[in-house]
């Protein structure tokens, strides 16, 4: 009777929302409600330390056998000493009640801790499991007090993408990441199984996908990419790669399910399919025998293959969603392919965007007939979205918002916040990566549903996902370093209510989690030693040319639209760049020209120095200039060169930053600054031309 009354009191608290929003520094993601002490009717007791080391009598109500076994295992993993009993004990109990509509959300939970024991209430077994993850953190903190915790997730989808195509990962490695995801109350693991770099799932109907397309030489993606992207037969000399057998995949699915995580498999189509086309070249577009990336949509054999593969995939993975990729199809080969042109004529398709949409629609219809739904990258919007498709928005937020406005479900994973393959600290201090800079604070700042979005549109946002691509991540230790703790930030975005989130508080909690992970043998980024952003970017620089007009000469006036920063004001706006060229401070130049600009100082001025910073990150094709010329003029017509600065551009792995400038004394109104690109094709990035 006492247990029942406590449960009812707690449920009333959660439903009617008393003022209980104090945060608990030991729980991540931060819970919705934490209250010290317990009230039973008019009798209230203050919070006191709770003896969590005592033996507990474990009992269940409304829990089936499978879930009871899972919850008992989770209780043991949480560090609790439990013994199953049939009936609820009077003291020293850990009792679970799982009934529909008891709590705010299906994944929500409530914990009442008294001196007599612990009561957990949840709508579903997954909610009870998340309660145990909270209890695990209380045990690890050594600070568990009597009181009430009421919690529920903000979003139903809280995920991580792990890329095992670029570099294959073992089942044991994936299990370790699943363990940590579960502790952070994440519930979706998106496995990127196929891409140009290798096919990673056994398919019996097309065996060359694993006997050939899963193996390459050399082992590392960068070396493989630079040496011609060559696939080799399994077992041949130097062959490197691997794949999940069906048995291993099923083992992984079961392991995740025991932790209430759903694995969503991704089978890329129609783009990113080089490995498929090298294993089965008959699926290439008809006019080009050489290497291709896009499946031929004109050939019916393509659909026969994809449907056969999907039949085997859905037999392994019980997930509601099957991810079908849909991103970055080049589409060029379709324009010339006779089979594709015939398909377009027969189906009345006006362009290649509609041709891709035709394939996505057919695949969706097929998967719907099997009781599954498709999810794809936001390119599936192009040419018309399939009626039941869910969109994963990665190129920004716009695609997701468009899909939500059209009534489609959306998972937000925008590049600028959720692509955690970029360095998380000063790039020179980090292992080689794809470039950029995405610190924990930037990840944590992401808001999936803007305040300007109408409520009825925001309801289509299912949640959020961190994506970790592995082009430059060879070792498992490096992968964990990139994944954690940034995935923890995404977990809190997905779970916690926005009014409860605070970065300073989160960072302190994340440091504790990272320290614990290191003790357990994980290799996360050690947040305590974070260097932070580029010092030059932390405050505006005041100089003689600040705010002055900049004229861009041909061809440099065509700075790349994607990296326009503040447009024509960029180079004299007083803002220095951060560690990343994507910060809207660095201005990027691409093409045959370099940087060639004239600054009008408005009047003849005494000048002692002129300089500008450039960056080099070779992975994404960002290089230093090979020559910088600086000239000055009084009238804007006749220029006198005052500096020729030569630089040998050397390919290296680590990002670098360099200032190219002149010092001396001169009188001038106009300054011409010209930076020449080197023999390496790619971008030049410059942030500010500083004149003193």
Regions found by a protein language model. Give the residues of each.
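Flexible, acidic glycine-rich loops studded with aromatic residues
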Residues: 374-379, 384-389, 395-540
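Active-site neighborhood of glycoside hydrolase catalytic domains
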Residues: 276, 285-286, 290-387, 394-401
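Bacterial Sec-dependent N-terminal signal peptides
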Residues: 1-25
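Predominantly extracellular/luminal regions of secreted and cell-surface proteins
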Residues: 539-576
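Aromatic, loop-rich ligand-recognition surfaces of beta-strand-rich domains
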Residues: 577-643, 654-692
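Contiguous, structured surface segment used for ligand recognition
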Residues: 23-155, 478, 490-520
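Feature activates predominantly on carbohydrate-active enzymes
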Residues: 102-303, 307-321, 362, 366, ...
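Flexible loop/turn segments at secondary-structure boundaries
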Residues: 168-170, 196-202, 270-276, 323, ...
């Amino acid at each position: 009777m006492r247990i029942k009354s406590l449960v009812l009191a707690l449920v009333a608290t959660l439903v009617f929302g008393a003022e209980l929003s104090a945060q608990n520094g030991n729980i991540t993601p931060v819970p919705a409600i934490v209250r010290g002490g317990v009230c039973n009717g008019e009798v209230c007791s203050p919070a006191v330390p709770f003896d969590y080391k005592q033996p507990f009598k474990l009992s269940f109500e409304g829990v089936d056998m499978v879930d009871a076994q899972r919850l008992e295992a989770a209780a043991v993993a949480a560090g609790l000493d439990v013994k199953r009993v049939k009936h609820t004990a009077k003291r020293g109990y850990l009792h679970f009640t799982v009934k529909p509509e008891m709590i705010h959300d299906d994944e929500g939970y409530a914990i009442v801790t008294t001196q007599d024991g612990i009561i957990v209430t949840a709508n579903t077994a997954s909610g009870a499991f998340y309660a145990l993850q909270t209890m695990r953190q209380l045990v690890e903190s050594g600070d568990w007090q009597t009181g009430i915790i009421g919690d529920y997730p903000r979003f139903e989808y809280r995920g991580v993408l792990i890329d095992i195509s670029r570099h294959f990962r073992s089942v044991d490695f994936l299990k370790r990441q699943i363990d940590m995801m579960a502790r952070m109350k994440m519930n979706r693991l998106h496995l990127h199984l196929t891409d140009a770099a290798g096919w990673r799932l056994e398919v019996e109907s097309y065996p060359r996908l694993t006997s050939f397309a899963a193996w390459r030489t050399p082992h590392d993606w960068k070396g493989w990419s630079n040496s011609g992207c060559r696939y080799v037969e399994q077992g041949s000399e130097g062959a490197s790669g691997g794949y999940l057998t069906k048995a291993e995949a099923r083992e992984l699915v079961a392991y995740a399910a025991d932790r209430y995580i759903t694995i969503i498999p991704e089978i890329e189509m129609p783009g990113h399919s080089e490995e498929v086309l090298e294993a089965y070249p008959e699926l290439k577009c008809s006019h080009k025998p050489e290497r291709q990336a896009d499946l031929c949509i004109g050939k019916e054999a393509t659909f026969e293959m994809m449907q056969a593969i999907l039949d085997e995939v859905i037999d392994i993975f019980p997930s509601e969603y099957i991810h079908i990729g849909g991103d970055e199809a080049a589409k060029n080969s379709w324009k010339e392919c006779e089979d594709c042109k015939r398909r377009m004529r027969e189906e009345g398709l006006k362009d290649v965007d509609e041709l891709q949409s035709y394939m996505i629609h057919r695949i969706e219809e097929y998967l719907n007939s099997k009781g599954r739904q498709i999810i794809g990258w936001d390119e599936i919007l192009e040419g018309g979205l399939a009626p039941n498709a869910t969109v994963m928005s990665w190129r920004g937020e716009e695609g997701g918002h468009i899909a939500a406005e059209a009534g489609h479900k959306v998972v937000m994973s925008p590049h600028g916040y959720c692509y955690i393959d970029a360095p998380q600290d000063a790039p020179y201090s980090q292992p080689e990566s794809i470039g950029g800079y995405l610190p924990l604070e930037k990840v944590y700042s992401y808001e999936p549903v803007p305040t300007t979005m109408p409520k009825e549109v925001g309801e289509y946002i299912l949640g959020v996902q961190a994506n970790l691509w592995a082009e430059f991540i060879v070792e498992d230790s490096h992968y964990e370093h990139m994944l954690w703790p940034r995935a923890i930030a995404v977990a809190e975005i997905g779970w916690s209510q926005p009014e409860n989130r605070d970065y300073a508080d989160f960072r302190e909690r994340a440091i504790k989690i990272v320290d614990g992970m290191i003790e357990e043998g994980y290799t996360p980024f050690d947040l305590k030693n974070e260097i932070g952003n580029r010092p030059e970017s932390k405050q505006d620089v005041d100089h003689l040319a600040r705010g002055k007009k900049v004229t861009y000469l041909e061809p440099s006036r065509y700075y790349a639209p994607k990296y326009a920063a503040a447009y024509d004001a960029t180079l004299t706006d007083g803002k220095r760049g951060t560690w990343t060229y994507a910060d809207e401070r660095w201005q990027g130049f691409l093409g045959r020209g370099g940087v060639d600009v004239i600054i009008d100082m408005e009047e003849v001025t005494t000048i002692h120095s002129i300089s500008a910073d450039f960056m080099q990150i070779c992975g994404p094709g960002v290089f230093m200039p090979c020559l910088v010329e600086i000239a000055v003029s009084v009238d804007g017509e006749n220029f006198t060169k005052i500096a020729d600065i030569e630089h040998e551009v050397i390919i290296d792995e680590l990002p670098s930053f360099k200032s190219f400038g002149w010092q001396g004394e001169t009188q001038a109104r106009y300054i011409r600054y010209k930076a020449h690109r080197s023999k390496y094709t790619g971008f030049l990035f410059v942030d500010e031309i500083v004149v003193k």
